[in-house]
A protein has these predicted regions:
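Structured loop/turn residues at beta-strand edges in well-structured enzyme cores
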Residues: 1, 42, 104
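A short beta-strand-loop structural module common to alpha/beta enzyme folds
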Residues: 27-38, 84
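A short, aliphatic-rich alpha-helical micro-motif
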Residues: 41-42, 73
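N-terminal beta1-alpha1 ligand-phosphate binding loop
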Residues: 2-25
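Surface-exposed, flexible loop/turn segments at secondary-structure boundaries
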Residues: 11, 36-38, 86, 117
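FMN-binding flavodoxin-like domain, especially the glycine-rich phosphate-binding loop
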Residues: 24-27, 55-163
Length: 163
């Protein structure tokens, strides 16, 4: 089965996660929405969409892609991942940003965690990350959730090879 991994990334975390998926899934293609917008998604059997979360909102390029391709996506095998620093809110982020129809039909949707690196931020985002960092519990870790990523990969592989 042909798999499309389509994503948007602000600081590289979502791209890193998309690359992990691409390396672990056979016959997969990875596309960054900041570079390509007009891929024929109909030729893929599984479509995986990844996005960062900023202040509870998905990337505008992902939102536009989903809106433009909604009728195709609702009839395809899909999976979604988000990268965010506040993993305890991940279900809320999905409920606020994705339709119930898409989530109900998804193979899996999950959070892959995040990275709060101030050096990768720019402008207002840099200021916000500094403020959030100061107000956070010092023991709180913001990191990629390898267990979630591996579980996600296994769920996709089961659909690719059901026997």
């Amino acid at each position: 089965m042909k798999t499309l991994i389509i994503y948007a990334s602000k600081t590289g975390t979502t791209e890193k996660c998309a690359s992990i998926l691409n390396k672990n899934l056979k016959d997969s293609t990875m596309i960054n929405l900041s570079r390509i917008q007009n891929e024929d998604i109909d030729k893929y059997d599984i479509i995986i969409i990844g996005t960062p979360i900023r202040m509870g909102i998905i990337d505008k390029r992902v939102k536009k892609f989903i809106s433009k391709n909604y009728n195709i996506l609702k009839n395809k095998k899909t999976a979604y991942f988000i990268c965010c620093g506040f993993n305890e809110n991940w279900k809320q982020y999905y409920d606020q940003n994705f339709s119930k129809e898409l989530l109900d039909n998804a193979i899996i949707y999950d959070t892959f965690g995040g990275d709060l690196n101030i050096d990768k931020q720019k402008g207002l985002n840099k200021f916000i990350v500094k403020m959030v960092s100061k107000s956070m519990d010092k023991n709180r870790k913001i990191e990629l959730l390898n267990k979630n990523i591996n579980n996600f990969i296994e769920n996709i592989k089961e659909v690719n090879n059901p026997y």
